[in-house]
């Protein structure tokens, strides 16, 4: 697969001759961080944070000289970290000062964040090259801006962001290592095709590789990758709200925003296993895998005339609605398409393409394959493409004055960066708590068990795969899969993409689709990557993409790509990386940002990475995050934000003693009406006490409280979170 960036470069070179000779300084540095992400370890959570923090730094460097805007970090308390700022003179040329502050801040911050990258030499050299191309001096390292040095202010801003990042609960100081999480399942050794029937079928299973190549192409020998960022829900967010936070415990405290509830757990089927939502979800993944056969000449219209335009109010909530929303047999989901291009007033032209080519291309296009800038970076790249388009009018939100390139980029990056970071915090908190299984483990598990449809057969098992003629069947005597001495007779076979065992040279070979043993099922991926190393529920792609699409819709003031269509050319036999293909060239097309987002979600099912249960709730949460991030960013842009109105601006508070006996003391700088709420670790409210008149010292009597661990929250009259502490009695 070519990365999205490569496609956009081709598009820009061939269709977008309008590019300015010189980008804004914010765009220059954004391009640098995207390239550094491609050269780093594949860590969507870490890089969403890097993109947000860098966007926040650049925004603050601009905002200090703007008459209306309010800084996010500089001179504020963000999370529980206070970044002091004593002010600086306003120069006669603010653009030059902003350029200098941004460059020094970004150079120092990115050098720190990527110093341990596997390709640190390349990235750090790139940072230095850009920095020195502006005429700046790497030897200026002072952070004392009291003499009105803009270079020093940039260094100071970077150092403060570095310090903040060392206490924002990301565990950056220990290379983001997990502190509490342990997997409940032993690793699946992929190539041995061993029995996988002894795992917990509702929990994530690590994968063991002879050679593992991560999403950015880094090679590891004899590797079993750990769960990436299962504790990320506790990282300081941008716009996530305290009232949407629940602290749950599954062997460690999980900070879960917008709790989606439990996924589908496997049922003990007594007959007709396909009626079990769990089995239906993973059987659908098998069914869609059968679409990846280039010898299948089934044609579908992939133009906006037929695809897209799926309203959020049509998203399923019940099992029956899921069965109607996703087309089990033919693939895809509901969506009426668009009758007309609203920009041109002309109908979209039909584009008939082989389903097998489209589904394979889509799976690779959005996959986190090698050389990926990860999903948050993908959407920054799309944002930059939109910004460069000749039909884009840079009115923020589609209203008001046309902005300079710098102001446009600065504001876009903060809004999108906040949405991407909050998506990572939200979804990885959910992933860490629910710890849900991936298709490769679930399908191999059920196939190891047997079948769950016919109770009269000796291979019936309540946890087996449901039998579906032409898709999931039993190996009979004489079957090509029967094996030596009929050793496989009675086992389960599935009709799916055959997997990497049938590919010697990806440039010339095609695995195709055929019957394979269910215990040897593979997602459509490279054998050195297979599936991202973290739980499936909920889908990061679905959430990142929906949040980004919502952000872009609000940023531009339009649902539609510039000109009413976004197009990406796919060359015959010069796109796929997992195997040869596609067999014909065609053009990927999307009318709206949300159409692209929805196709991203479906691509993960065709690729065998997610079942439907991982998808929809991620889209819904992503929509919410995109709106909330944009709304909060707008408040900063217009200077209408109150420091106590959002969850990330918390009040300095001491809670002691810990552990407490019968009395807990709370000392706070917040002197207005306050409500103290005590919660169990399961999120149950134990008691709530409203205090109107106090001098900043509050006492709580705990005589009747059972021994244990609790969460104490302080909430303002406007229901904003002031502080949150874990306490022990």
Please report, for each region that a protein language model flagged, where it lies by residue.
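Sec-dependent signal peptide recognition
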Residues: 2-10
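C-terminal outer-membrane/trafficking sorting elements
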Residues: 5, 15-18, 645-729
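A general, composition-driven signal for non-globular sequence regions
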Residues: 9, 403, 535, 719-720
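Residue-level signal for alpha-helical transmembrane segments in multi-pass membrane proteins
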Residues: 12-16, 62
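Acidic/polar surface patches and capping/hinge elements
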Residues: 22-641
């Amino acid at each position: 697969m070519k990365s999205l960036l490569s496609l956009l470069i081709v598009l820009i070179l061939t269709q977008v001759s309008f590019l300015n000779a010189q980008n804004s300084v914010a765009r220059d540095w954004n391009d640098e961080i995207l390239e550094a992400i491609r050269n780093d370890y594949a860590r969507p959570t870490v890089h969403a944070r890097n993109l947000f923090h860098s966007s926040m730094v650049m925004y603050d460097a601009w905002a200090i000289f703007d008459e209306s805007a309010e800084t996010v970090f500089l001179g504020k308390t963000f999370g529980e970290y206070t970044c002091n700022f004593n002010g600086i003179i306003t120069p006669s040329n603010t653009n030059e000062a902003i350029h200098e502050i941004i460059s020094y801040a970004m150079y120092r911050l990115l050098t720190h964040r990527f110093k341990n990258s596997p390709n640190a030499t390349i990235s750090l050299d790139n940072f230095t090259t850009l920095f020195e191309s502006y005429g700046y001096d790497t030897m200026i390292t002072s952070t004392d801006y009291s003499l009105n040095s803009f270079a020093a202010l940039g260094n100071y801003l970077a150092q403060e962001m570095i310090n903040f990042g060392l206490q924002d609960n990301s565990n950056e100081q220990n290379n983001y290592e997990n502190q509490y999480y342990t997997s409940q399942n032993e690793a699946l050794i992929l190539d041995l095709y061993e029995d996988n029937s002894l795992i917990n079928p509702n929990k994530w299973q690590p994968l063991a590789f002879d050679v593992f190549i991560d999403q950015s192409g880094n090679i590891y020998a004899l590797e079993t990758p750990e769960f990436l960022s299962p504790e990320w829900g506790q990282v300081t967010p941008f716009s996530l709200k305290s009232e949407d936070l629940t602290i749950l415990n599954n062997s460690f405290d999980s900070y879960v925003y917008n709790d989606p509830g439990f996924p589908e757990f496997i049922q003990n089927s007594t007959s007709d296993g396909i009626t079990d939502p769990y089995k239906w979800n993973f059987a659908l993944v098998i069914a869609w895998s059968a679409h990846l056969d280039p010898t299948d000449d089934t044609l579908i219209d992939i133009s906006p005339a037929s695809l897209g335009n799926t309203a959020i109010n049509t998203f399923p909530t019940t099992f029956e609605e899921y069965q109607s929303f996703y087309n089990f047999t033919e693939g895809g989901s509901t969506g009426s398409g668009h009758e007309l291009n609203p920009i041109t007033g002309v109908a979209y032209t039909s584009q008939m393409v082989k389903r097998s080519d489209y589904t394979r291309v889509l799976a690779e296009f959005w996959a986190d394959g090698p050389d990926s800038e990860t999903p948050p970076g993908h959407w920054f790249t799309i944002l930059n493409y939109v910004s460069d388009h000749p039909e884009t009018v840079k009115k923020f939100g589609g209203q008001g004055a046309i902005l300079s390139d710098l102001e446009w980029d600065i504001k876009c990056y903060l809004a999108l960066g906040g949405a991407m970071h909050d998506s990572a915090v939200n979804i990885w908190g959910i992933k860490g708590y629910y710890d849900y299984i991936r298709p490769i483990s679930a399908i191999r598990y059920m196939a190891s068990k047997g079948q769950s449809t016919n109770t009269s057969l000796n291979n019936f098992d309540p946890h087996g795969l449901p039998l579906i003629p032409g898709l999931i069947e039993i190996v009979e005597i004489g079957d090509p899969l029967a094996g030596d001495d009929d050793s496989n007779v009675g086992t389960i076979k599935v009709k799916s993409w055959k997997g990497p065992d049938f590919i010697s040279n990806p440039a010339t070979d095609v695995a195709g689709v055929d019957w394979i043993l269910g215990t040897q099922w593979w997602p459509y991926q490279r054998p050195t990557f297979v599936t991202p190393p973290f739980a499936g529920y909920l889908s990061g792609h679905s959430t990142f993409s929906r949040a980004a699409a919502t952000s872009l819709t609000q940023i531009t003031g339009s649902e539609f790509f510039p000109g009413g269509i976004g197009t990406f050319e796919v060359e015959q036999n010069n796109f796929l990386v997992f195997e040869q293909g596609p067999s014909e060239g065609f053009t990927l097309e999307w009318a709206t940002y949300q159409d692209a987002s929805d196709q991203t979600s479906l691509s993960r099912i065709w690729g065998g990475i997610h079942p439907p249960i991982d998808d929809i709730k991620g889209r819904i949460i992503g929509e919410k995050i995109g709106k909330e991030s944009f709304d909060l960013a707008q408040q900063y842009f217009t200077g209408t934000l109150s420091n106590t109105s959002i969850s990330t601006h918390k009040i300095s508070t001491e809670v002691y003693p810990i552990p407490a006996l019968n009395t807990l003391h709370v000392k706070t700088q917040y002197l207005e009406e306050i409500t103290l709420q005590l919660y169990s670790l399961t999120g149950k409210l134990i008691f709530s006490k409203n205090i109107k008149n106090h001098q900043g010292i509050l006492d709580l009597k705990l005589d009747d409280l059972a021994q244990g661990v609790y969460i104490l929250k302080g909430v303002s009259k406007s229901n904003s979170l002031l502080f949150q502490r874990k306490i022990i009695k």
